[in-house]
Amino acid sequence: MVDRKRNYKDRDNRVEWEERVVSVQRVTKVVKGGKKLSFRAVVVVGDQQGKVGVGVGKASDVSTAVRKGVTDGKKNVITVPLTSSNSIPHKINGRFGAAKLVLRPSAPGCGVIAGGAPRIVLELAGIKNILSKQLGSNSLLNNARATIDGLSNLRTFVA
């Protein structure tokens, strides 16, 4: 019988993941005795070779929240098709909640023109030349997830 957990961990160790914290927020829950304080961390993990994921972790201290976010991000990894110029194959729109995002391929040498959370997601995906525009929400988490939505809907065209 194959041990699935061992295979998952072996696969995880072979890939060199880079992780970046997008935001850490203090959140409170009102309980009978007062307010219970905890932290929410939004983390992006990627290998800069076309694999990227966004994770969220909540805990009573920041380091545990970040660690949980990294674990969650590794569970939600997507593969991004890259062109030879490290861009995306075509224009795409991403949406998550009220956050809308437009992603357009750009010429080699242009760089990553994006702001906030989408920039982190695109850099960790290994995309070097892209234009993006955020519309709608200012939420870092929703913009990161909108970026993931757009990247997951990319298609490659075979001639």
From Swiss-Prot:
Keyword Ribosomal protein: yes
Xref: PROSITE patterns: RIBOSOMAL_S5 (PS00585), S5_DSRBD (PS50881)
Signal peptide annotation: none
Gene3D superfamilies: 3.30.160.20, 3.30.230.10
SUPFAM superfamilies, per the entry: dsRNA-binding domain-like, Ribosomal protein S5 domain 2-like
Residues of the S5 DRBM domain: 17-80
Superkingdom, natural source: Eukaryota
InterPro entries listed in its UniProt record: Ribosomal_Su5_D2-typ_SF, Ribosomal_uS5, Ribosomal_uS5_bac-type, Ribosomal_uS5_C, Ribosomal_uS5_N, Ribosomal_uS5_N_CS, Ribsml_uS5_D2-typ_fold_subgr
GO BP terms in the entry: translation
Cell location: Plastid, Chloroplast
One CC-aspect GO term: small ribosomal subunit
Keyword Ribosomal protein part of the UniProt annotation: yes
GO terms, molecular function: rRNA binding; structural constituent of ribosome
Keywords: Chloroplast, Plastid, Ribonucleoprotein, Ribosomal protein, RNA-binding, rRNA-binding
Comment, domains: The N-terminal domain interacts with the head of the 30S subunit; the C-terminal domain interacts with the body and contacts protein S4. The interaction surface between S4 and S5 is involved in control of translational fidelity.
Function: With S4 and S12 plays an important role in translational accuracy.
Self-association and partners: Part of the 30S ribosomal subunit. Contacts protein S4.
Family assignment from sequence similarity: Belongs to the universal ribosomal protein uS5 family.
Protein name: Small ribosomal subunit protein uS5c
